[in-house]
Amino acid sequence: MHPMLNIAVRAARKDRSPSRLGKDVLAICALADCVFLGLHGADGEDGKIQAALDLLGVPYTGSDYLGSAMAMDKAVAKRIMDSNGIRTPAWRELRYTEADIPRLCEELPVPCAIKVVNGGSSIGVQLPDTREELSSALRDVLRYGDRVVVEEKIYGREMTVPVLGASALCPIEIVPPEGSSFDYVAKYQSGSAAAAEICPAPIGEEETKLLQETALKFHRALGLAV
């Protein structure tokens, strides 16, 4: 949980609990015939809720706890991509402290992408282009966690492919505002700061087929619900 969100949740609860789950929520879920999961972020996407429902013997929609946990962990997901021949930017996993930053600034390539392994919504993501930017990026990312993935920075169009059941749906092209990346603001704000999402993506049949096949292959490798 983000530190500021933790503080806000505690302040809103009489018992000062940091839990984002309401009182007796698991007891309520235990009464359900099936739980429809529409959760986003930590606890909802990382398999924790799914594991709790499994312990209660309550069926739910979507992927199970293991697939969710592996997909949420970028380092685990990258290893699965590598072992299944799915192309992904060159990468390495790091666990570091403030004291390691000077050494890492000498070792790591720039430009690069730095991502907290279990983050989402582009929180804890930095895209340094110079050694000076790399130093400040490594310090900033430490606010969200000390375990990160450092990737080769690649350039091109960004696509996402939804998977429903056993079918890959139409690829969607994501077009951030000019001069920006697909960051938190571009994902969730409206107006000129928002990214455009074009569906179906303006690409050919061959590219569409390749994207859909890759999405299904990755889903199956992770054990996600397909």
Name what the model sees in each region.
Residues 222-226:
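Short, intrinsically disordered, charge-balanced linker/junction segments flanking boundaries
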Residues 22-29, 68-157, 209-212:
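Active-site nucleotide/adenylate-binding loops and adjacent lid/helix of ATP-dependent enzymes
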